[in-house]
């Protein structure tokens, strides 16, 4: 991707040299409007689509330069990829889950900074985890108790810190299957302790 400008501005074209790596090789779609693009230490919000290789954006965080790069990220939530089907708070993090493209993926915000979804390796950084399973387990609900209980179409899972009583961080998340009953879209109700 190459931005026409590196500064915070509106109406800036961002051009891709090819559709490779954009929406599974389909390039930019009209449903990408509103989606965030991040690269070169900056961020831009897509405001319109010109064609499969050009989008018009509002740069919200300045890019370090206007050099072309193949290292970029498109925001996970959009009309193209789907929006989260459930949301919860867990250990001072806002957690989204269950998009159309990533039905068994959990998106955790930065601890105490609910709008910051920038992943990293620091203990308080945002993180993204996908439930590993032999089948697609679309997430139906999440319930925060001592652990984050995640109900999916194929079973129930818990998300917690790796064998400790510590808070979850990008380096210690454990996701364990608890049962194989499967869940509906009805929210869980805690019973007992």
Describe the function of each predicted region.
Residues 73-93, 98-193:
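Beta-propeller and closely related beta-pinwheel folds
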Residues 1-71:
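Autoprocessing Asn-cyclization modules and mimics
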